[in-house]
Every structure is written in structure tokens, then in C-alpha cells.
Amino acid sequence: MSRDLTNHLLFEISTEVCNKVGGIYSVLKTKAPITVKEYGTKRYHCIGLLNRDKYEVEIEELPLDYDILHNKCSKDDDDYPIKEAILKMRDRGVGIVYCKWLIEGSPKSILFDLDSVRGKYLNDWKKDLWVSNGIPSPDSDFETNDAIILGYLVTWFLGEVIYSDQQKHALVAHCHEWLAGVCLPVIRHRKLGVVTIFTTHATLLGRY
């Protein structure tokens, strides 16, 4: 079965999804209404990390379990493989909040709880990033560690979506800044069928 390029699934990935830190939050907030209008709420999802200190004022959590998936959703729905992927990862111990971001357009969003997997997977993922891509990481750099965890969770999630989707849709992953971009070399190394986009902003990386 050939993948549907016209009705592709778009995932926008940033550490500022549902997490107001700097300018990227404003960029995402500004583009959300037109993106949701073009893609609808089933083909466009934002992905970020769960900031427990502030996420509750940014989102409305959406109920999702296997009963809802099997009894209230159709396998023909564009977002069925996305919901199934979330549930499969939850079964493996990954903390995930599935929600509606309370900004204009109300994009569906997926927030990963990095602490839910930090102790179990971080060292293995740091080793894999070095072995597979030659990218080193400091032992105790919290920011880099978070970027690695988020990157591997995004890669894992996209792999689950591809498996559940059975090649019905093309997938596009748009990553904002290096903090959300670790998934890019991992996706390429694993040869996942995902179109990737990287945008850098008014940061040190973007300017120089």
C-alpha cells in the first residue's frame, strides 16, 4: 500500500509546546490557527515535554484508554494510529499526557514525562547516540540529557505510529531547535519513513 502524501500526518516538535519559555512558544502559538485550519485536529499534533510546574494552565487533558479507542474511534480515523501509539507507549511505562493546547486553534498535543523513563533508558540512549551517530554527550548536562530523552521518545512514538498506520499516511516531523532535534539523526539512522524538517530560531545556533 502506498502512503497518502496529500493527507500526511504533521507533528510539530518543540520543548515550548504547552510550555511558555521564549520566542518559539510565540511562533507555535501564531501558526497554530492556520495549521489546524489546513490540517484539521486529526492530522496535526504538537509534541513536547511535560513541565509539571505549569502544564495544567496550558492544556485540557483528553481522556484516552483502550475502551475509548476501540469503542469510540474508527480505525479509518486519521488519528487512530496516533492514539494507539500513545497507549502502547503507556503500556511500556512512558508517562504521556494527551491534551488540547488552550491557544487559538486548540491543537491536539502530546506531552512526554521525561522522568518516567530517565532512570531506565537514558544511559542506553546516550550510548546509542554515540555508537550510531558519533554524537557525544556530557555525563551530567541536564539540558542535553533532556534533549536526548525527548529525541528518543519522539523516535519511538513515530515508529509506533508507522507500525499502527500500516503505511496509510506519510509522516512529517518538524523539529524546532536542537533541544527538540535529537530525533533527526536517530530517525535517519533507523531508516524510519518520516520526512524531517529542522528550524532554528533566534538562538546561538540560529545566528552563527
Predicted feature descriptions by range:
Residues 1-208:
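Catalytic cores of nucleotide-sugar-dependent glycosyltransferases that transfer UDP/GDP/TDP-activated
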